[in-house]
Amino acid sequence: MTALGTPIQGVTLYSFTRAFHGREYDLEGLIRKTAADGFGPGLEIIGFSSFRGFPAIDDAYAGWFRDLIDEVGLVTTSLAVNADIGIHRDRLLNQDELIEYMTLQIKAAAKLGFPIARVQISIEPDSMEALAPIAEAHGVTLALEVHADQYASHPRILALRDRYEKVGSPFLGFTMDWGATVSGFAPSLIEAYRRRGASEELLGQVVDLWNTYYEQGPPADQADHGQRFGSFIGLAARHGRPDLGIDFGINGTGLFGPARVDDWRTIAPWIKHVHGKFFGIDENGEEPSVPVRDLVKLLVENGYNGAISSEYEGWHWNYWQSPFDIISDEQAVQRSAAEAAGSRMITDLAEARTQLGAWLPNTEGAHA
């Protein structure tokens, strides 16, 4: 029988993007607030949006960053890196260029002290296999993000899982993104549309349309996905709000994934990191559109001892509530869910460091 997991509480600074872009806080200020407000001990950061000149990181800056993390009492969990094969205007990266591009980011993660690099779905099985020895050399686990409109049992994800099994490297795995298993259209986004003048009739039909697709489950293929996207656009147009159509489609099909919680069991042994994506907390102190309690229970029951980075995506549209208050409330739900599952979340720094070190593979003498 699998021992119950004790996930590590954490947050990604992506949750505070509005405050960062509004220059309420710089990177250091956000890190200090994360520690002071008890959102850690786990800390996740996005490389390109947080570190000037990334992935080029000099020794002095890396030293300053590591010292800051130690000073405030956090533990680095995951560095979100990019796998954008379209960085050139006129062509896509070839395989060799992609490996070089990713290698620079893996080295940066190691230099900054991150044990995980979150990579994106544009990385295919051949590339992940080629990157495995590079990840091993630098002691960085590559955790590909399973993000809506993908889901755990999607053919592309299963192909990666099967390749991981073939390669046999403990440095390859997945980042579980809760946005793939959403159970309702986010009420906070409905409120944002209301504030943009959408009629109650239109908003009701948006929710009804999403609920219909939820009952059907994930799209069968890209054609089905495209049809769903188009139906949101058509709905907006019929109600005289074509300006909202693309937004409905992006969120309805690419942010709120309709897979079921149990779908994650398909790749559970390969989940190395978790994005605890959510969109808001209601008046009852619960997340009304993401089954947080069921997701935490599944992780606990599967012996998950890695970090959960609370990832508040509602900042894109919710300008009237504090993201810091919302993160605090959502993490309370996670802790309550872990206790209800017979376990707990790790909030102690020393425990988190020890547990994360045991959870992830390491390479003796790994260096940047």
Curated annotation (Swiss-Prot):
Pfam families per the UniProt record, alphabetical: AP_endonuc_2 (PF01261)
Cofactor: a divalent metal cation
Active-site positions on this chain: H147
Signal peptide (from-to): none
Keyword Metal-binding: yes
Chain positions recorded as a divalent metal cation binding sites: E145, D177, H275, E311
Gene Ontology MF, one: metal ion binding
Activity as a function of temperature: Optimum temperature is around 40 degrees Celsius.
Enzyme class label: lyase
pH-activity profile: Optimum pH is 6.0.
Superkingdom of the organism of origin: Bacteria
This enzyme's EC code(s): 4.1.99.-
Keywords, alphabetical: Carbohydrate metabolism, Lyase, Metal-binding
Subunit organization: Heterodimer composed of an alpha subunit (CarB) and a beta subunit (CarC).
Annotated family: Belongs to the C-glycoside deglycosidase alpha subunit family.
Function: Carbon-carbon bond-cleaving enzyme which participates in the metabolism of C-glycosides. Acts on the C6-glycosylated compounds 3''-dehydroisovitexin (3''-oxo-isovitexin) and 3''-dehydroisoorientin (3''-oxo-homoorientin). Shows weak activity with 3'-dehydromangiferin (3'-oxo-mangiferin).
Name of the protein described by the UniProt record: C-glycoside deglycosidase alpha subunit
Originating organism: Microbacterium trichothecenolyticum
Gene: carB
